[in-house]
Amino acid sequence: MSNRWLLPENIADVLPSEARKIEELRRRMLDLFRTYGYELVMPPMLEYLESLLTGTGHDLDLRTLKLVDQLSGRTLGLRADITPQVARIDAHLLNRPGVTRLCYAGNVLHARPAGFNATREPIQIGAEIYGHAGLEADVEIQELMLAALQVAGLSDIRLDLCHAGILEALLAALPSIRQIEEAMFAALETKDVPALRELTQGLPDTERDALLALPTLYGGVEVIERARATLPASPAIGRALDELAALAAQVSNASVNIDLSDLRGYHYHSGVMFTAYVSGLPNYVARGGRYDKVGEAFGRARPATGFSLDLREVAALSPVEVRAQAIFAPWDADPALRFAITTLRANGEIVIQSLPGHTHELDEFNCDRQLQRQGANWVVVPR
């Protein structure tokens, strides 16, 4: 009996004060996206597994909860990431010829937590641009991501930039690397140079030296010039570094770091990647980048770039106060009071009628005004 109310590990209820804050930030961000011209879409919570994982990497498969559809007998997946679903909508349902801007907000479910104490039910919100291959789309998405963090009240943001094209160019001449690929990615992400040195034994000197240099290419924008001097002078690497320099130059409201070994999502991304951190905290608060290859898996190759964040994580960091301003009203059968309350609520005001015998029901609200009888009418006065 005592464990009936227990929830699965890393799953938690959202209580009123947190829910109010999350909803306030969700509305602010969606309103922000709308001012940029982004259209809201609402993909389903579950899909056939093969559709849900189309064009994604092995990591998303591991994070996806599976179940059997009792109607069709086919395997379903509960979404662990909304981004591929939005790419499917753009490629398969909308089928527009030009630029499309889409945004979304909804719960996702992870089979395994992404980190220590991480929730398995994030509330993901994000925005995507389809149809433009130029860096201008990446600049807009990067700007929108930083603006979303600002409307949440977060400040002192650091933006880390990377580019999937650099590693792709280094690995293009190394087909044998596929055998150690996962271990190599893990060593690069953790900047474990000794492990990377051991893994890359036997590789050609040029590529091995470049791979060993990636974890050291971390710091301010001056890292880009260090990378030009350190990495092979291939056209692909040169273009990638040029794009990073151009993207960094567009940032005015955050500090910029270059981290050429921050390769989380490498199999998914195809160009620039950016990650936002709040100063002093180890975990990122938002991630984005270019992923041109995903739409191709749905039968329509489209340039694409976007970002996403977890509203629950951002709400926990946000200083935004959302204790609602409300109007107190007594419990009274007077029709004039009912009319006054109905009119106020129709105008968007929160009006709380105190039920007889209860004194603590207003604690979650700031009732700075009250309805008071004046003659035959009820009027709002300071409380």
From Swiss-Prot:
Q: Where in the cell is it found?
A: Cytoplasm
Answer whether the UniProt record assigns the keyword Amino-acid biosynthesis to this protein: yes
GO cellular-component terms in the record? Answer: cytoplasm
- Chief subcellular site? cytoplasm
Q: Which UniProt keywords apply?
A: Amino-acid biosynthesis, Cytoplasm, Histidine biosynthesis
Subunit architecture: Heteromultimer composed of HisG and HisZ subunits.
Q: What else is known?
A: This function is generally fulfilled by the C-terminal part of HisG, which is missing in some bacteria such as this one.
Q: Which NCBIfam families match?
A: hisZ_biosyn_reg, PRK12292.1-1, PRK12421.1
**What's this protein's function?**
Required for the first step of histidine biosynthesis. May allow the feedback regulation of ATP phosphoribosyltransferase activity by histidine.
- Recorded protein name is ATP phosphoribosyltransferase regulatory subunit
